[in-house]
Curated annotation (Swiss-Prot):
Its EC number is 2.7.7.6. The gene is rpoC2. Pfam families: RNA_pol_Rpb1_4, RNA_pol_Rpb1_5. The lineage of its organism: Eukaryota, Viridiplantae, Streptophyta, Embryophyta, Tracheophyta. It catalyses: RNA(n) + a ribonucleoside 5'-triphosphate = RNA(n+1) + diphosphate. The keyword Nucleotidyltransferase applies. It comes from the Eukaryota. It comes from Piper cenocladum (Ant piper). This is DNA-directed RNA polymerase subunit beta''.
Length: 1380
């Protein structure tokens, strides 16, 4: 015997290798097969003891030093970043749109992360095979490669809470530590691990409860149900052999299996490991097995369809509660699933491409006949190989062979030199044709501000016919022409019109620097900023406006612009008759002339609407001679005063913003009687008495002292006390003097006051007023008076030069003086402010006699600035002809927008100042320039183009010195070149370092210059400031809404051309031409950024910067052509498909999502087409009835298999092994219900009723009629509430509702399940109680006596009903005879 054992021991093979968990399972199963359970358990005890001893001796511990980073990580990350930079550049050039960029970026980083993961294993094996991290991660005991990869490799891409990829990868690993940004992104991804473990455990418990609820009544009750169906379990190419073996073992064969004429396995044979080995040996192809899916029973299962019992390895016994076992088998690992989810939570693992890298430097060679030229999905050229391809790389010393699998892309040429670790091939991930994809909307937001233009026609989407959503029919570019928009409040720059150039300087250091958008509307008042001229900055550079402190609040319907250079003594108006309008320039002071008067300046007053009526004040001048700083009273003497204008025409806010009417005097002088006024609160104590006389600097109240001495008058009112101090003298008159009791008297100089004691003669005007104290003798207060003589006003001859006065035919301008306060009205001056008593106004009128102008009641004013020969002059232009108002409307065609004439009757509230259409046409060098101004919306926005938005391509150097000489020569001929180069394109001074200057150029017109010849003479091109907006096809487009654009002088920089290069390349440059980045304009130079030509000169171009975005067909564009875009606005929406990443909702949530049959967010675009094609093809092949029948059957079968595979995939990804039969029992229950449809009426079931699939088929066969139903997927919860037992349903949830419904319907519970018997305290029909249940059901079958009784009762009832029917019919016949 010992000899025999020794021989057997000699035959055994000695294995010397590491054994993992899978190999251990195999060993145990082989030991059980050979030696039985008892001997195997003895061996395993020894193995356990050995393991503990070795682990104790080794004393493996995990320290931070054991986490070894991978040396190749640095250059791998650099390589990925380099690819990302190239991708970013292509996106910037407009070659790649945002979605492509996102996809490629994700693929680049995923491939890098995966390659790093593979390198990690190799690195550990070569450098430190006994590393504790390496031993633990690959032993299968704890942890996996993905977690170690995050520790020592890189965390990689994360998903956000919505499941979308964050395209910024985490390049660090946990050993190196994360940056702040990476940490925040990491928190996004690891969101699932933050939730408390207790919550997760309760989730798993609830899942188990629902699972058991659905299948608790499933018990093995028969040996064979007699089914003749089977489900294919043949090995597939994509299926691993291990999974295939696991799927087969434990099932029963459905059909005999033949290899040729020989039967190697019979029907209903149990499949064990021996039979599986025989299948592998004979390579059996068509294997069909029995599963719980095909069992013919409705509420139980047979032994052969279930297969082996998982406990003893034999066929399952009768009475086994396999449903409860299945529910617990799936629910129990749920706790592990949830707890394990934390480690890889959020890390993206997708099925993207895998790269093959060259092992060393060398020349690559492959067989060119085996590959075909193609392009990758990103459009890059490549070679496609259909079969296995061997690639050789010849280095100096060694020859490397690399095997490329089929359907891969070769990314290099044959015989090309490659560097080590260079990507030479791309292996596509094996994705099935029916892999689920989801439809994703990606919104692209603008990262800059400006105007939107597109380079192709667009269609309106039907649901947004009147909106701003457009659909692109073909690939095109969206251009964002640079500029800084400012939201207008509807009245901004109402004086400034198209082509006005402004230089804006903020000189105030006390305020923060503000731009034009600082016009804020609050409480229907607009805080206005004043325009004032700094005389020190006048010169050839133009005039500079100063946005200084807000001057005052003015009414919302009137705008005052202070412009201090107008109407000075040395300034003059110029009015010339130009086609029914006159132009008034405001010239600044020239050199050598007198300095301007120190005054607050002239204010131009033009309403917000731009409408001027007859006798309207065009401008006014506040003379400093008529300005007072204290309170007082104005007196006109005894002359009557009449009001000139209505209250609403002239509105002035000052002081307490009281509305005051303006008056006109008929005398040459008026008087101002000064007085000191103090307004004190009613509760304050006054330290002087009424009618007392005080001196200067006397304390009259707490913290209040008098500035002058004199008589004190105190008037007490409800809430305040008014204290006045009258300076002057006090006289006690004699009995003969009579003075009015009520009002005072103005006395001219020279009058004498005589009595016995004194005689006095007054030199100036005085104001005499009688004062009567209580119970005392009255006295007289004599107060000094300030006399003002009003001059005749400014002579028009001094304002206008003589030659222009003769030409102002229909213009009437007159100077009128207004006194702003009424006769005797008290004027209250606030401290430290001055009061203007008289205002000089320029009143506008036009000729009444002229027939053309006499009927015009309103004219339209606008502000114009004209430049010529570097001299800038400003004008107010008043159009005496009412312009024609046009509406901007949409046409039905796709050509853009057109102008639709409108009589204006339906738009009475339109702002005429903006809705005016100006069209100018003139011919210049065979080019036509068109200008049109569109109707603005209520709040028209502005666009400011600043120096960062445009660029300058510098002077061209062709042959060095020759070019310089030519440049000097051209400067001699045209000295304006030097000035232009210094001032910038618009002739303004360049930016000074210490001065915050902003130069603006206003336009809201679109000018098209079709053909513009390049000219040598710069002086002929003064219209270069004109601005255009056109599309690429040369059509004038009328944008909606119209915008006001402010272009900066420094935004429009020069691009100098040389005549030699122009002649050789082209002869015509068109305005509006769009250039891509690095595109070549002319022969010797490509310019830096993308942009659009704004101005063409003889030797240069001004180009406006533009940002372009690529948009593919089907993309949705938001916004109109020419609309102003703000940063962060949605530009375009792409709709694209992406594969669903199975890792995003992993663990228990994924299982629950599948079992509860929750609808996914979106389905693939091609899925519906596939289903329609399937229906058409199968009905063509099999005919209509059979096609639909088989199609429906296949759909149910396929959906069941798909659900099982999805759940198994989640569990396998977490390393949990569950047999298919458990999942199949659950899936069978949630797919076994059908919904009765309303298409065909049935006597058996009502429409909308949920019934079992087998019950519906059997009922249809029994009644011999078709029952129309459709298959339905019920979730776990719904399936629990739709069982045959209402007691089971009520014990699950919604107890009251379920019991009430069951009572109303009269439902019967046959107590077939476990739960209902437990609730009622009966014996459960499983295990030992199963035999009693079978015996009881047989007794139910023995009911012959009951049948006889029932038949007797039925016969008697039928006879009674028949007798009654005969009586009823005879009565009816008798009645008919009577009536007939």
């Amino acid at each position: 015997m010992e000899v025999l054992m020794a021989e057997q021991r000699a035959d055994l093979v000695f294995h010397n290798k590491a054994i993992d968990g899978t190999a251990m399972k195999r060993l145990i199963s082989r030991l059980i097969d050979h030696f039985g359970m008892a001997y195997t358990s003895h061996i395993l005890d020894q193995v356990k003891t050995l393991g503990f001893q070795q682990a104790t001796a080794t004393s493996i511990s995990l320290g931070i030093d054991d986490l070894l980073t991978i040396p190749s990580k640095g250059w791998l990350v650099r390589d990925a970043e380099q690819q990302g930079l190239i991708l970013e550049k292509h996106h910037h050039y407009g070659n790649v749109h945002a979605v492509e960029k996102l996809r490629q970026s994700i693929e680049i980083w995923y491939a890098t992360s995966e390659y790093l993961r593979q390198e990690m294993h190799t690195n550990f094996r070569m450098t430190d095979p006994s590393n504790p991290v390496h031993i633990m991660s690959f032993s299968g005991a704890r942890g996996n490669a993905s977690q170690v990869h995050q520790l020592v490799g890189m965390r990689g891409l994360m998903s956000d809470p919505q499941g979308q990829m964050i395209d910024l990868p985490i390049q660090s690993n946990l050993r190196e530590g994360l940056s702040l940004t990476e940490y925040i992104i990491s928190c996004y991804g690891a969101r699932k691990g933050v939730v408390d473990t207790a919550v997760r455990t309760s989730d798993a418990g609830y899942l188990t409860r629902r699972l058991v609820e659905v299948v608790q009544h499933i018990v093995v009750r028969r040996t064979d149900c007699g089914t003749i169906r089977g489900i294919s379990a043949s090995p597939r190419n994509s299926m691993e052999e291990k999974i295939w073996i696991q799927r087969l073992i434990g099932h029963v064969l459905a059909y005999d299996i033949y290899i040729g004429p020989r039967c190697i396995a019979a029907r209903n044979q149990d499949i064990g490991i021996g039979l599986v080995n025989r299948f592998i040996t004979f390579q059996a192809k068509s294997i069909y097995i029995r599963t719980p899916f095909i069992c013919r029973s409705t509420s139980w299962i047979c032994r052969l369809c279930y297969g082996r019992s998982p406990t003893h390895g034999d066929l399952v016994e009768l009475g086994e509660a396999v449903g409860v076992i299945a529910g617990q088998s799936i629910g129990e690992p749920g706790t592990q699933l949830t707890l394990r989810t934390f480690h890889t939570g959020g890390v993206f693992t997708g099925g993207t491409a895998e790269y093959v890298r060259a092992p060393s430097n060398g020349k690559i060679k492959f067989h060119e006949d085996l590959v075909h030229p193609t392009r990758t999905r990103h459009g890059h050229p490549a070679f496609l190989c259909y079969i296995d391809l061997y690639v050789t790389i010849e280095s100096r010393d060694i020859l490397h062979k690399v095997n490329i699998p089929p359907k891969s892309f070769i990314l290099v040429q044959n015989n090309q030199y490659v560097e080590s670790e260079q990507v030479i091939a791309e292996i596509r991930a094996g994705t099935s044709a029916l892999s689920f994809k989801e439809k994703v909307r990606k919104h692209i937001y603008s990262d800059s501000e400006g105007e939107m233009h597109w380079s192709t026609n667009v269609y309106h989407t039907p649901q947004y016919t009147y909106g701003n959503v457009h659909l692109l029919p073909k690939t095109s570019h969206l251009w964002i022409l640079s500029g800084n928009p400012c939201k207008s409040n509807g009245a901004l720059f109402s004086l400034h019109k198209d082509q006005d150039q402004m230089n804006l300087y903020s000189l105030s250091l006390s305020l923060e620097q503000r731009s034009i958008s600082d016009f804020s509307v609050t409480n229907d008042r607009v805080r206005r900023k004043s325009f004032s001229l700094d005389p020190s900055r006048e010169g050839r550079g133009g005039r500079f406006f100063d946005y200084s402190v807000p001057d005052k609040s003015i009414p919302n319907d009137c705008w005052n612009f202070i412009y201090s250079a107008i109407l000075h003594e040395n300034s003059y108006f110029l009015a010339k008759r130009r086609r029914n309008r006159f132009i008034i320039p405001f010239q600044y002071s020239q050199e050598g002339e007198k300095e301007p008067m120190p005054c607050s300046g002239i204010s131009i007053e033009i309403p917000k609407t731009g409408i001027l009526r007859r006798n309207t004040i065009l401008a006014y001048f506040d003379d400093p001679r008529y300005r007072r700083s204290g309170s007082g009273i104005t007196k006109y003497g005894t002359v009557e005063v009449d009001s000139l204008v209505k209250k609403e025409d002239l509105v002035e806010y000052r002081g307490e913003k009281e509305l005051r009417t303006k008056y006109q005097t008929k005398v040459d002088r008026f008087f101002f009687i000064p007085e000191e006024v103090h307004i004190l609160p009613g509760s304050s104590s006054i330290m002087v008495r009424n009618n007392s006389i005080i001196g200067v600097d006397t304390e009259i109240a707490l913290n209040t002292r008098s500035r002058v001495g004199g008589l004190v008058r105190v008037e007490r009112k409800k809430k305040r006390t008014e204290l006045k101090i009258f300076s002057g003298n006090i006289h006690f008159p004699g009995e003969t003097d009579k003075i009015s009791r009520h009002s005072g008297i103005l006395l001219p100089p020279g009058m004498e006051k005589k009595n016995s004691k004194e005689s006095k003669k007054w030199k100036n005007w005085i104001y005499v007023q009688r004062v009567t104290p209580i119970k005392k003798k009255y006295f007289v207060s004599v107060r000094p008076v300030v006399t003002y003589e009003i001059a005749d006003g400014i002579n028009l001859a001094t304002l206008f030069p003589q030659d222009s006065l003769q030409e102002r035919d229909n213009v009437q301008l007159r100077v009128v003086n207004y006194i702003l306060y009424g006769n005797g009205k008290p004027i209250r001056g606030i401290s430290h402010t001055s009061i203007q008593l008289v205002r000089t106004c320029l009143v506008l009128n036009w000729d009444q006699d002229n027939k053309k102008t006499s009927s015009i009641e309103e004219v339209f004013a606008s502000f114009v600035e004209v430049r010529a020969n570097d001299l800038i002059r400003d004008f107010i232009r008043v159009d005496l002809v009412k312009p024609r108002v046009l509406n901007t409307g949409k046409r039905n065609d796709t050509a853009g927008y057109g102008l639709n004439p409108d009589n204006g009757s339906d738009c009475p509230n339109r702002n005429p100042f903006y809705s005016k259409i100006k069209i100018q046409s003139f011919t210049q060098d065979n080019g036509t320039i068109h200008t049109s101004l569109n109707i603005n919306k209520q709040l028209p926005p502005f666009l400011i183009l600043s120096s960062s938005n445009c660029f300058q391509a510098g002077p061209l150097k062709v042959n060095g010195s020759k070019s310089d000489n030519g440049k000097k020569k051209s400067i001699k001929e045209d000295p304006a070149i030097l000035i232009r180069n210094f001032f910038g394109p618009l002739g303004t001074i360049a930016k000074i370092t210490n001065l915050d200057s902003r130069n603006y150029y206003l336009t809201d017109n679109q000018i098209l210059l079709k053909k513009y010849l390049i000219l040598d003479n710069f002086k002929n091109l003064f219209q270069d400031v004109l601005y255009y907006l056109i599309d690429e096809k040369g059509r004038i487009l009328n944008p909606d809404p119209c915008s006001n654009i402010i272009l900066n002088a420094f935004d429009l920089n020069w691009c100098f051309l040389h005549h030699n290069s122009c002649e050789k390349t082209f002869s015509i440059i068109s305005l509006g031409q769009l250039f891509y980045e690095n595109g070549s304009i002319y022969k010797y130079r490509s310019h830096i950024k993308s942009g659009q030509i704004v101005t063409v000169h003889g030797d240069s171009l001004v180009i406006r910067s533009a940002k372009l975005h690529l948009a593919t067909p089907g993309a949705t564009v938001h916004g109109h052509y020419g609309e102003i875009i703000y940063e962060g606005d949605t530009l375009v929406t792409f709709i694209y498909e992406k594969s669903r990443s199975g890792d995003i909702t992993q663990g228990l949530p994924k299982v629950e999502q599948v079992l509860e049959v929750r609808s996914i967010d979106s389905i693939s675009m091609n899925l519906e087409k596939r289903v329609e094609g399937w229906n058409e093809n199968i009905t063509k092949i099999l005919g209509i009835p059979w096609g639909f029948l088989i199609g429906a059957e296949l759909t149910i079968v396929q959906s069941r298999i798909s659900l099982v595979n999805k759940i198994q995939k989640v569990y396998r990804s977490q390393g949990v092994q569950i047999h298919n039969r458990h999942i199949e029992i659950i899936v069978r229950q949630i797919t076994s219900k059908v919904l009765v449809s309303e298409d065909g009426m049935s006597n058996a079931f009502s429409p909308g009723e949920l019934i079992g699939l087998l019950r519906a088929e059997r009922t249809g066969r029994a009644l011999e009629e078709t029952i129309c139903y459709r298959a339905i997927l019920l979730g776990l919860t719904r399936a629990s509430l739709n069982t045959q037992s209402f007691i089971s349903e009520a014990s699950f949830q919604e107890t009251a509702r379920v019991l009430a419904k069951a009572a109303l319907r009269g439902r019967i519970d046959w107590l077939k399940g476990l739960k209902e018997n437990v609730v009622l305290g009966g014996m459960i029909p499983v295990g030992t109680g199963f035999k009693g249940f079978v015996r009881r059901s047989r007794q139910h079958n023995n009911i012959s006596l009951e049948k006889k009784r029932n038949n007797l009762v039925k016969g008697e009832i039928g006879n009674i009903l028949f007798h009654h029917r005969e009586l009823f019919s005879s009565c009816i016949s008798k009645n008919k005879k009577k009536f007939s």
